[in-house]
């Protein structure tokens, strides 16, 4: 499995001959113009995880890609043209297994209505398992080898992020 960080929350996962893009948001531009994607996954509707201005062009340029997103993102961003994914759903992209987990975005402020968030466990056969939680800090699946952890101010407190990373117990954290 090859994992390329494209900026902020966006990563490109290449595994078992498949190319899977996660969270093409507006704080990273390296994903724009990518082609030959087999899947595009979005954890939630915030623009730093799915760029509403440019996502349509990415989807159009990858017309054969499976596009899945948390339900709120599907409804709020029509250009995403995604099918909703919920915790417990399993996708098979070639030999790559993807399981949606979580369901709740980390609390931003007690006065703000909570939104949905799905994290993704991405694995190739019996090999490496990557966990991309989006902005979920409660779901701590076991058996994770690589954690793509949200660790960015001003949205996440470093104490919360470190506690979360330790609780997942992945061999590698990035």
What are these regions (language model features)?
Residues 10, 52-59, 74, 119, ...:
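Short amphipathic alpha-helical segments and helix-helix/interface helices
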Residues 55-106:
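Portal/gating segments that form or line small-molecule/metal binding sites
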Residues 21-22, 41, 131-132, 148, ...:
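Structural motif
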Residues 64, 158-174:
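Proline-aspartate-enriched helix->loop->beta-strand connector
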Residues 1-35, 84-143, 154-160:
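Core dinuclear metal-dependent hydrolase active-site scaffold
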Residues 148-154:
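Short, glycine/charged-rich beta-strand-loop motifs at protein surfaces that mediate ligand recognition
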Residues 46-47, 73-74, 137:
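Alpha-helix capping/helix-boundary segments
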Residues 26-69, 144-148:
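Active-site metal-binding motif and surrounding structural segment of the metallo-beta-lactamase
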């Amino acid at each position: 499995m090859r994992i390329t960080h494209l900026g902020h929350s966006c990563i490109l996962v290449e595994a078992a001959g498949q190319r899977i893009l996660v969270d093409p948001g507006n704080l990273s531009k390296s994903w724009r113009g990518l082609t030959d994607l087999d899947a595009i996954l979005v954890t939630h509707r915030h623009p730093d995880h799915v760029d509403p201005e440019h996502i349509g062009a990415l989807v159009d340029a990858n017309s054969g890609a499976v596009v899945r997103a948390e339900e709120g993102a599907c409804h709020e961003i029509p250009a995403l043209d995604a099918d909703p994914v919920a915790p417990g759903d399993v996708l098979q992209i070639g030999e790559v297994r993807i399981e949606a987990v979580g369901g709740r975005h980390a609390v931003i402020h007690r006065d703000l209505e909570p939104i949905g968030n799905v994290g993704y466990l991405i694995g190739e056969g019996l090999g490496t398992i990557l966990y991309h939680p989006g902005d979920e800090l409660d779901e701590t699946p076991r058996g994770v080898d690589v954690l793509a952890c949200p660790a960015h101010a001003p949205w996440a407190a470093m104490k919360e992020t470190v506690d979360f990373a330790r609780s997942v117990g992945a061999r590698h954290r990035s």
